[in-house]
Amino acid sequence: MGGIREKKAEYFAKLREYLEEYKSLFVVGVDNVSSQQMHEVRKELRGRAVVLMGKNTMVRRAIRGFLSDLPDFEKLLPFVKGNVGFVFTNEPLTEIKNVIVSNRVAAPARAGAVAPEDIWVRAVNTGMEPGKTSFFQALGVPTKIARGTIEIVSDVKVVDAGNKVGQSEASLLNLLNISPFTFGLTVVQVYDNGQVFPSSILDITDEELVSHFVSAVSTIASISLAIGYPTLPSVGHTLINNYKDLLAVAIAASYHYPEIEDLVDRIENPEKYAAAAPAATSAASGDAAPAEEAAAEEEEESDDDMGFGLFD
């Protein structure tokens, strides 16, 4: 009895030490994870993060005991359920998450297991004898006999994502040596500096954030302009639009000031500027003409040279 109490006290002390030392942690699911996989994950995280497992009742009791000093960790309590553990770190969260979820192993289908994604049987020659054709037909898998063996003629989805694998489907997948499941640690929730959020947040890239920000600014500016309510994103557009209106009123009222004299001159004397444009174009073409003539002469000389060889 004394040994159990000592172990609990030791666990509580270690959990508190990690909660105070590390600013971030992952709540990880460890269903169907082998001890070898856990060993590999610990090995890859060594020096960057620490893994701590424990019974949920003991973890909840420990956290509740720390709440007077560490109130932010109350947010973790709803996620301490099922087969879970903790990974503590001060390293970049995305990097640690990638290490956590990367160690996965393939596993055969079991009747009653829930498919995490669609399970397909691909078109392939199975190498099986024709006597097992009825087994495929019962599951709606199209087959033909090719060179004395059963061949699946097209891809077939045998289990939809989220559905349970039936006994027949499990038998078929195992018969074909298809291991549709992968088992490994999963990230249930992330805690970082007092905030708790799902791991999908870590998948958002900087480019996506910038894109969403630019889109939001554009939307705010459009709405602000439409309702005539000034906001920081719309002020620049408002000033430009108002200045255009000011120019239009000034020109219509023949009220000229130095900053618009050039614009007024272009409006009142368009032919002057229209004549200047062809002149500039002809000048450019005139400069190009001698260059083209020189190039043509060089080509002629080159062609003439080609008529003579060393032995003529």
From Swiss-Prot:
According to the record, the residues making up region (Interaction with P1B-P2A) are 231-258
Q: Which InterPro entries match?
A: Ribosomal_protein_uL10, Ribosomal_uL10, Ribosomal_uL10-like_insert, Ribosomal_uL10-like_insert_sf, Ribosomal_uL10-like_sf, uL10_eukaryotes
Gene Ontology biological-process entries? cytoplasmic translation; ribosomal large subunit assembly
Please give the superkingdom of this protein's source: Eukaryota
Q: Which residues carry this modification: Phosphoserine?
A: S68, S302
Kindly list the places in or outside the cell where this protein is found, as annotated in its UniProt entry. Cytoplasm
Q: Where is this region: Disordered?
A: 278-312
Low complexity bias spans: 278-293
The record's section on PANTHER family has: 60S ACIDIC RIBOSOMAL PROTEIN P0, LARGE RIBOSOMAL SUBUNIT PROTEIN UL10
How it assembles, according to the record, is: Component of the large ribosomal subunit (LSU). Mature yeast ribosomes consist of a small (40S) and a large (60S) subunit. The 40S small subunit contains 1 molecule of ribosomal RNA (18S rRNA) and 33 different proteins (encoded by 57 genes). The large 60S subunit contains 3 rRNA molecules (25S, 5.8S and 5S rRNA) and 46 different proteins (encoded by 81 genes). The 5 acidic ribosomal P-proteins form the stalk structure of the 60S subunit. They are organized as a pentameric complex in which uL10/P0 interacts with 2 heterodimers, P1A-P2B and P1B-P2A. uL10 directly interacts with 28S rRNA.
Protein name (database record):
Large ribosomal subunit protein uL10
Gene that this polypeptide is encoded by: RPP0
